[in-house]
């Protein structure tokens, strides 16, 4: 039973570790659903993090239907993760019909070598989550991150529970999207899942001397993983 934290900065990754997370999913652009992190962020986090590090591989926002050039970008990013000694990668690719893009996934998983693989929330916008789950198992993925095809894991609790039953011991189903200390126990009871995914973020005040009078989207407050929020979720998961 444990918590994976989605982190989009060095500070967030270290806060996740300090709060007791079992694993970090490192990404960039978390407010846009997450993208592949920068090389610098990845390298520094890898140097400083002691818990397992998985890296989101997603070259752009939008759907999960990728052309050949985008798959090649992703493959090279996966290779970078291998070179830096990451523990795993977080992948997902669909075809235009909403099914798993098996050739793309096989190419990426081959590039990952011995790294672990999580199939991400592409399952939630697929045509058939149950079929995607079977494909993820066949591909050798360790886990699937899902909100149960809803905006939040709490809303998708019934679908997540069905996926947990379908998966059995073959693969881990990890609820994510809106997971917090306020709902993690309900999600645990309602789904039977054993690991959960959250960003556990809180606001960080801008250090700029004064707000700009005309520009509000640059240089302001931002969100960062909060040690106390992580610890609260972890403690609830450790409660019998």
Swiss-Prot record:
Keywords: Cytoplasm. It comes from the Bacteria. It is found in: Cytoplasm. GO terms for cellular component: cytoplasm. One of its GO terms (molecular function) is copper ion binding. Belongs to the CutC family. This is PF03932 family protein CutC. It comes from Xanthomonas campestris pv. campestris (strain ATCC 33913 / DSM 3586 / NCPPB 528 / LMG 568 / P 25). The lineage of its organism: Bacteria, Pseudomonadati, Pseudomonadota, Gammaproteobacteria, Lysobacterales. The gene is cutC.
């Amino acid at each position: 039973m444990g918590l994976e934290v989605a982190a989009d900065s060095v500070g967030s990754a270290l806060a996740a570790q300090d709060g007791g997370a079992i694993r970090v999913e490192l990404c960039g652009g978390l407010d846009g659903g997450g993208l592949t992190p920068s090389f610098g962020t990845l390298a520094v986090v890898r140097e400083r993090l002691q818990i397992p590090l998985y890296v989101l591989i997603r070259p752009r926002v939008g759907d999960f239907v990728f052309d050949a050039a985008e798959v090649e970008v992703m493959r090279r990013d996966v290779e970078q993760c291998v070179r830096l000694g990451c523990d795993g990668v977080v992948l997902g690719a669909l075809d235009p019909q909403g099914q798993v893009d098996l050739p793309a996934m096989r190419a990426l998983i081959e590039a990952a070598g011995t790294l672990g693989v999580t199939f991400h929330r592409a399952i939630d916008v697929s045509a058939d989550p149950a079929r995607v789950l079977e494909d993820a198992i066949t591909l050798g993925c360790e886990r699937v991150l899902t909100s149960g095809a809803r905006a939040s894991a709490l809303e998708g609790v019934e679908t997540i529970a069905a996926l947990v039953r379908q998966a059995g011991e073959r693969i881990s189903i990890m609820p994510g999207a809106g997971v917090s200390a306020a709902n993690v126990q309900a999600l645990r009871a309602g789904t039977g899942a054993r690991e959960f995914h959250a960003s556990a973020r809180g606001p960080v005040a801008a250090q700029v001397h004064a707000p700009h009078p005309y520009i509000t989207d640059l240089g302001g407050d931002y969100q960062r993983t909060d040690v106390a929020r992580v610890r609260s979720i972890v403690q609830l998961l450790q409660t019998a």
